[in-house]
From Swiss-Prot:
Pfam families: OSCP (PF00213). It is a peripheral membrane protein. This is ATP synthase subunit delta. F-type ATPases have 2 components, F(1) - the catalytic core - and F(0) - the membrane proton channel. F(1) has five subunits: alpha(3), beta(3), gamma(1), delta(1), epsilon(1). F(0) has three main subunits: a(1), b(2) and c(10-14). The alpha and beta chains form an alternating ring which encloses part of the gamma chain. F(1) is attached to F(0) by a central stalk formed by the gamma and epsilon chains, while a peripheral stalk is formed by the delta and b chains. Belongs to the ATPase delta chain family. It comes from Clostridium botulinum (strain Hall / ATCC 3502 / NCTC 13319 / Type A). The keyword 4Fe-4S does not apply.
């Protein structure tokens, strides 16, 4: 529902990062802040606490991140606190990563297999996907024993499911329909 808003925030920060030639640094800093928030129960409690006012939350964030992140990132975080959107920072990070990929003619391909791909298989998959999408492919591999065998590929909204688990489910459905 708020994807459009997340994208606008991310685009604004991305443009600032580009102007300052710090896109990689901003992405790295934002990931670090997201991880800190996600892994700190205390920070989450503070951010969600209705009796801690916005000014105090901003002070806490300034104390926490002043010397750890670029001033523009800190300003961005403070705006998100002001607009009550800081709990959705991870969504802004994901949108900023998408923008980075788009601007650099790259696309993310999520691959699931039971065992790791061999180097040759990985290279061939990257080449074929690169030709299909006419972009540089960033491969994200995941080992998933539940697929039993085969490969699952997701590129954007496109899915190629060549897994044994899906084939077995399809066979089961066909058998149940015939009964």
């Amino acid at each position: 529902m708020y994807e459009y808003l997340d994208r606008r925030y991310a685009l604004a920060l991305y443009e600032v990062a580009e102007e300052n030639n710090k896109v990689d640094e901003y992405l790295r800093d934002l990931k670090e802040v997201v991880n800190i928030i996600k892994n700190s129960e205390d920070i989450c409690k503070i951010l969600k606490h209705p009796e801690i006012n916005t000014s105090r939350k901003k002070e806490i964030f300034t104390e926490l991140f002043k010397d750890k992140v670029d001033d523009k990132i800190l300003s961005f975080l403070l705006v998100l606190i002001e607009k009550d959107r800081i709990l959705y920072l991870e969504e802004k990070l994901k949108e900023m990563e998408k923008i980075y990929l788009e601007k650099n003619n790259m696309i993310l391909a999520n691959i699931k297999t039971v065992i790791p791909l061999l180097k040759e298989e990985r290279e061939e998959l990257i080449e074929k996907l690169g030709n299909k999408y006419n972009k540089k492919i960033i491969l994200e591999e995941e080992i998933d024993k539940s697929i039993i065998g085969g490969v699952y590929v997701r590129v954007g909204d496109d899915v190629l499911d060549g897994t044994l688990s899906t084939r077995l489910k399809d066979i089961k459905k066909m058998m149940l329909k015939r009964e």
